[in-house]
Amino acid sequence: MPGMSTLRIGTRGSELALAQTHQAIAALKAANPGLECSITIISTAGDQRTDIPLHMVNSATNTGDKGVFIAAIEEALAAGEIDCAVHSLKDMPGVLDSRFELAAVLPREEIQDVLVMKADANEDKLVIATGSVRRSHMVHTYWGGKATTVPVRGNVATRLRKLVENPEVSATLLARAGLNRLGYDRDSFEVEGTQVRIIGLPVREFPPALGQGAIALECRKDDALAAEMISRVNHLPTYRCISCERAFLNLLQADCSVPVGGYAEINADDSITLNVVHYSDATHFTRLSETGTDPEAVAVALHATLIRA
């Protein structure tokens, strides 16, 4: 099959999205010698509607079941304006539109959430900014009466700026993967002259969003050439884990706005374990795990247990 000279890649325009896209391009070029890549920046509903909570953006923008950070990029993919879309996997709904396929995932970064806290904050009386329903529920479970939450929207840089500019807020919650990719891979740093420190949260007690830490590369199902080239960068251990996590999301008919956290991990015997915390409301949750050899079968079994719980 003759090669493709230039792969047109669509992505969001945030600093993190572009960092992830450049990481994907480096992998694609290494796996496909001679390949050139171009970047098309696409503004999504999630980027445009920062005036409302994230879980309300779907209904406000008529994006339906599609992820608010991917629908516009998929439209460009369907129209043939781009050949490949690069996403944060956690932003993707459990089921893709039948016109597209998840051609590859890059090796997964650290999956945990972290608390980014002002250095002088009172740890016994935290005010934590988050736009995530999942994180908000988990704050109350993890810290109890020592923490309250306030809403915030925006990319990593915006949330860090809002943290240091608001004297009433003592901390915010972010994915460690995103901070690492932006160069904040240390225990403390300055934001506009204010010292902040990073506290990693244990994944069993404060589980991440399903799919967190993984970068996804999506293409059209009918584009065999792009799919072949992209598949060369696929990291199979990560793909097994995210396949299990996404199968569970599909069974829940959930997306990134649903209050469920968890992660899959591959064991020494090559079996896979899916660990999940599902919130029915802010104070009631179910913690479950399931182990097996087939990622989708593990997800089905855990979902059946959740239904019976």
Task: Give the location of each predicted region.
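Small-molecule-sensing regulatory modules
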Residues: P2-I52, M56-T63, S136-M138, Y142-A309
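Alpha-to-beta junction loops
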Residues: I73, A78-H87, N166-A177
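Ordered, amphipathic secondary-structure segments that act as subunit-interaction surfaces
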Residues: A78-M92, Q212, A216, R220-D223
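A conserved helix-loop-strand patch within extracytoplasmic ligand-binding domains
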Residues: L89-A147
